Amino acid sequence: LALEIPIECLNSDGDGIIGAWTTASLPQAEIEDPSPTYEQPSFYGGAYVQQSRLSAPLVNELVIGLPDKDLFNAAEPTQDGALAQYVTNPSLPYLLDVLFRNPVNSTLGPDIANLAPTNLPRQDLITAFLTGFPGLNSPANVVPSEMMRLNMGVPATPRDEQSTFGVVDEDLAGFPNGRRPGDDTVDIALRVVMGALCHPVPLGAELGVDGAVEETDSDLINLGLCDPQDAAGGTVPFTDGAPISASELKDVFPYLNDPIAGSPNN
């Protein structure tokens, strides 16, 4: 599904920041038809029950623990406080450390003893996934909850000028301030989970920091969420090896390219 909605239809309270998520639901009951047909082997009825939920990518797949994945799928964002420990104390960084510490050290040269960030609880991940960034896409009186937040007041970046790394690469119109088709959300999420926000980021001028000048050292700021020593692997360019770029996509709504056609013989 792709919807194009005027901003004025979404900005009811005037602060310009929205949060969104999608859900899928199925009827509560399935009854086997004693005289089934190919088209209808069963009957469905009862209230619709939420089966899945999605906003930011990979949250349920990689952040929420196995015992609570079904609970997350059935929950509303107002219930996310019960699942916050998966964000504040995630297991994914430890898994990535086990899998990739030796390759990182042998490829990049450093002798990192542990790739996993040590700043527990992870305030940087609470900001990235549950509240949004102050001054960018965090609304007033925000309640920590997992949703895709967007500051509609940030001008859209022209397609040819977009950075696939979004906010962390000085493109405030990109992920996690919303999500564009050309944002490399997997690479961004990997780097944030491994502590990229503990290191200085070139956002001083973009966020209006006094004295910050674009393309100078003054543009590098610490967001105050954690410190570089908390994340030895925070500058490692983690990637899934599947790059994407807005220039590969259409420049008109809905922007996504047509799917590759399947075999005509199937």
Predicted regions and their residues:
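Surface-exposed extracytoplasmic segments
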Residues: 1-266
